[in-house]
């Protein structure tokens, strides 16, 4: 839906393009801004040569998204995440000579997450990064993270919601202590932290001499 990020309501598939374009964006705290909803092409044009971009749910529209990234020359900046089997992703990427980055999402405490992680390991596939999700930091989670880093991939942690990071979320970093959140994530081996509070995270990383 467009509920979380704009002042509009409803599912994208039920709303016309013109209606969506009239919506304005909201801040992370739900406050309306004066910024109109951009198209993917407009957003990527602003990001070109500046930052990496994660297109959420982008795999479902890979062909359309890739056509735009190739047109703008930003394909190497764009990341797609998902939970699909290795061969499914490989087959899709084989259709093109130039692809966006792809990162598997591993819900390591769920059977399907463990199976996907084991599949990557058994096939000898080393993605650029894994997003590991967990709601309770168990020995199994710790072992998975260690294996990710030891295998040559980066460890991506999503700190947006408690259920994705065992309670080590942005809100806790803001209301309690950045060190208790971001410090612990770094100690776990995380080298990529997805955040809704970039200023807070950047200040912490710079203070620790950990920003690259």
Pin down the residues of each PLM region.
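C-terminal active-site rim and adjoining tail of enzyme catalytic domains
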Residues: 30-32, 111-212
